[in-house]
């Protein structure tokens, strides 16, 4: 099923912050954030067992428990099982994401992309989310940022396990769509080139943004559009760097990134627009993009995101970005064509 048809609106909600990403978020604040998203009209919520070792899914399930199930769409991820046993979270080996979720639940997380583990993961997520169905399942993080030189072996495990399981679940009507949920372009390229598999789309985080988009633009977006698939873009603010935060790719931003942000902001200020408007509207200008899912850990962020989509961004802003070499000249922008 096309993600463009399945997803209810262009703005969704990424729940990673609700897993206590970077900080310990009080329950009341987490609930207020989900309520703000719902009251704003957002009806697509992306989750993952990895986010706080199930914490984000639990919070989302509690917040949506009294909402009509046919009114919203849920995606979650497979590839990580959350066990009942606990562990020292500081001892976890989580690749580039390091201690991002050190304030989450202490339950042990194991990487497992096998067929049986995929079925178990879906069942576990259904329980945490307090729902009877999940519309979209993403295979999570089969990429270099987590597995280094072993990523191809993990991808092969997913090819023979998770991909087959999700194909079956979709054919049986348990889910409506599946694909990869990754922070790198290469796994998507690889899956698109495989025969015999029929993904419905992809969740690509941090790789189609104002700050980093060239490889995705050249290698993924055209194929996705040609096949009638869709991309959900996560991390449109590049871990917060685009909107003045200190991090890029879950780590302190480099001087080069900070300089690029400053140059973009100079142009945005000149035209009287917010950096959020620039970031979100750039992403959604690509016809392959079905939705964008900024993460939010505070209620006020929801209103900011919605307002950013409504801002009028002058065409001269995009032209000046291109002329300054701050975006790829081939990247679609609002008003093209």
Locate each region found by the language model.
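Short, well-ordered coil/turn segments that N-cap beta-strands
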Residues: 7-11, 41-43, 68-72, 131-135, ...
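Active-site mouth loops of central-metabolism enzymes
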Residues: 16-28, 103-119, 150-154
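Short, acidic/polar
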Residues: 24-37, 114-128, 184-192
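Beta/alpha (TIM)-barrel catalytic core signal, keyed to glycine-rich beta->alpha loops juxtaposed to Asp/Glu
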Residues: 29, 139-337
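N-terminal binding-site loop/beta-alpha segment at the start of enzyme catalytic domains
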Residues: 1-92
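Short amphipathic alpha-helices and their capping/turn segments at secondary-structure boundaries
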Residues: 1-5, 57-73, 118-133, 217-230
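Active-site gating/metal-coordination segments in enzymes
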Residues: 87-135
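Conserved, mostly hydrophobic/aromatic
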Residues: 13, 30, 45, 60, ...
């Amino acid at each position: 099923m096309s993600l463009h048809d399945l997803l209810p609106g262009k703005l969704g909600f990424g729940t990673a912050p609700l897993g206590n990403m970077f900080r310990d978020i009080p329950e009341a604040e987490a609930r207020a954030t989900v309520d703000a998203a719902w009251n704003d009209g957002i009806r697509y919520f992306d989750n993952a067992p990895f986010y706080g070792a199930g914490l984000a899914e639990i919070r989302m399930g509690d917040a949506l428990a009294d909402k009509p199930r046919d009114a919203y769409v849920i995606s979650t991820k497979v590839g990580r099982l959350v066990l009942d046993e606990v562990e020292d979270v500081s001892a976890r080996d989580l690749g580039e994401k390091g201690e991002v979720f050190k304030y989450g639940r202490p339950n042990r997380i194991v990487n497992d992309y096998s067929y049986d583990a995929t079925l178990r993961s879906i069942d576990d997520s259904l329980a945490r989310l307090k729902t009877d169905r999940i519309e979209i399942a993403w295979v999570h993080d089969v990429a270099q940022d987590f597995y280094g030189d072993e990523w191809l072996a993990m991808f092969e495990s997913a090819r023979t396990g998770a991909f087959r399981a999700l194909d079956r679940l979709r054919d049986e009507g348990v889910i409506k769509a599946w694909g990869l949920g990754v922070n790198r372009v290469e796994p998507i390229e690889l899956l698109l080139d495989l025969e015999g598999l029929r993904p419905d789309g992809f969740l690509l985080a941090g790789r189609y943004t104002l700050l980093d988009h060239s490889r995705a633009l050249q290698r993924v977006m055209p194929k996705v559009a040609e096949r009638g698939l869709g991309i959900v873009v996560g991390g449109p603010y590049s871990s917060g760097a685009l909107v003045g935060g200190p991090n890029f790719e879950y780590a302190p931003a480099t001087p080069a990134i900070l300089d690029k942000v400053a140059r973009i902001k100079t142009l945005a200020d000149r035209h009287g627009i917010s950096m959020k408007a620039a970031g979100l509207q750039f992403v959604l200008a690509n016809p392959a993009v079905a939705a964008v899912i900024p993460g939010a850990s505070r209620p006020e962020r929801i209103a900011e995101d919605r307002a950013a989509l409504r801002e009028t961004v002058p065409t001269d802003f995009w032209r000046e970005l291109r002329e300054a070499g701050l975006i790829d000249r081939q990247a679609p922008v609002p008003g093209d064509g």
